[in-house]
Every structure is written in C-alpha cells, then in structure tokens.
C-alpha cells in the first residue's frame, strides 16, 4: 500500500504542477508500475530516484530520456485530459530549464523538488479522498480493494491482501486508515519498516 501511495503521490504532484486548476484530477500510475523490477524494500525517502524515474518514464514513451510535447500530450490524453497545443507548449516551457524544447530527468527532478517544497494540505486531502470513497474520513479494506481493483493492480486484488496493506499503516489499530495516518505516512520519510 505504501508503494502505491508513494508512486501515486509523485505522479499526482507532477500533474498538479502542470495541469490547469480547472482540469486537475487525480490518477494513479498503476498501469506503469513494473512488478518485475520493484524498488529495494529498504528505500526510505518519498522522492527516491527510483520512484522519480518511474514517474518520468510514464511520460517518456520512447525511453530516450526526454519528454517531448507529443509524449506529454499522449500521456495526458490517456488520462482523459485534452489540452490545446499552446497549453502543452507552456507546460513544457515551464519545466524546460535548458531551452531544448524537451524535459530531461534532471529538469524533472528539479521540478519535483520544488513541488515537494510547496505541497499543500488540500492536495493531500484530495489524494486521500480518492481512496475514501464514501467520504467518512477513513480508508477501509473494502474501499482500498475497490480502488485497487478498478486500477487493475495485482496488489490488493483480494480483501485479505488489502487488510494486510491497511495494517501496515494503521497506527491506532482500528482496521482503517484515517487522514492523520495517511498524512503522516505520506509526509514522513520513514517508510523502511512499512514497505
């Protein structure tokens, strides 16, 4: 569960920085997660190079180490976000520090660093609300299972698996993840005992 939340948070932060406010939605990067090459279990930083690279690769479709306007457009369209060409150009320019018309991994990492510094409580609440489907302030086993299943993730396909994921972050032992637990998990750097 922690790994899914971390990748989700990285991807979501990137989209929040780029997509105009009226079009902002929250999408998990589940369809890009490579189960064959998982990151080492002892990673403890939310913005680890492995996770940042995975998010970058979501947009770098041809794997050349650069995100072009076309690749950004394709990725956003796959998420149901359709942007005018002029907005796509502005998005690339916002990230393109060296002026080559593309975004490389270093520019992406710099952008993410600034996003992390400016993270707002509202963004975290919106991310939490994706999983808290009934709006009662808790992520239950059933809600987690519903989200994980709808995303087509291998992790969390069974209620038992989701229960185990909940237990990993449930600090008060009530069998659910409340917003405080979610926020602490996302903002703390101590994921080594939960991964």
UniProtKB/Swiss-Prot annotation:
GO molecular function, one term: calcium ion binding
Keyword Repeat: yes
Residues involved in Ca(2+) 3 binding: 132, 134, 136, 143
GO cellular component entries: endomembrane system; endosome membrane
Keyword Signal attached: no
Binding site for Ca(2+) 4: 170, 172, 174, 176, 181
Chain coiled-coil ranges: none
PROSITE patterns to which the protein is assigned, alphabetical: EF_HAND_1, EF_HAND_2
Superkingdom: Eukaryota
Record key words, sorted: Calcium, Metal-binding, Repeat
Residues that coordinate or bind Ca(2+) 2: 96, 98, 100, 102, 107
A Pfam family it matches: EF-hand_7
Alphabetical list of InterPro entries matching this protein: EF-hand-dom_pair, EF_Hand_1_Ca_BS, EF_hand_dom, EF_hand_pair_protein_CML-like
Residues that, per the record, bind Ca(2+) 1: 60, 62, 64, 66, 71
Residues of the EF-hand domain: 47-82, 83-118, 119-154, 157-192
Job of this protein: Potential calcium sensor.
Family: Belongs to the calmodulin family.
PANTHER family xrefs: EF-HAND CALCIUM-BINDING DOMAIN CONTAINING PROTEIN
Name of this chain's protein: Calmodulin-like protein 4
Organism: Arabidopsis thaliana (Mouse-ear cress)
Gene label: CML4
């Amino acid at each position: 569960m922690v790994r899914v939340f971390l990748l989700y948070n990285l991807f979501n932060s990137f989209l929040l920085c780029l997509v105009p406010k009226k079009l902002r939605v929250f999408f998990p990067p589940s369809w890009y997660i490579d189960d064959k090459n998982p990151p080492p279990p002892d990673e403890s930083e939310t913005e680890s190079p492995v996770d940042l690279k995975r998010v970058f690769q979501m947009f770098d479709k041809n794997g050349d180490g650069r995100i072009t306007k076309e690749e950004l457009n394709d990725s956003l369209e796959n998420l149901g976000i359709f942007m005018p060409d002029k907005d796509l150009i502005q998005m690339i320019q916002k990230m393109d520090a060296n002026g080559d018309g593309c975004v490389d991994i270093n520019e992406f990492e710099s952008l993410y660093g600034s996003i992390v510094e400016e993270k707002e409580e509202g963004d975290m609440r919106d991310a939490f609300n994706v999983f808290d489907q009934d709006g009662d302030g808790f992520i239950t086993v059933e809600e987690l299972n519903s989200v994980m299943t709808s995303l087509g993730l291998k992790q969390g396909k069974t209620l038992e698996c989701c229960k185990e994921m909940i237990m990993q972050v449930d600090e008060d032992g009530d069998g659910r993840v409340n917003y405080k637990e979610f926020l602490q998990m996302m903002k703390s750097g101590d994921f080594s005992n939960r991964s």
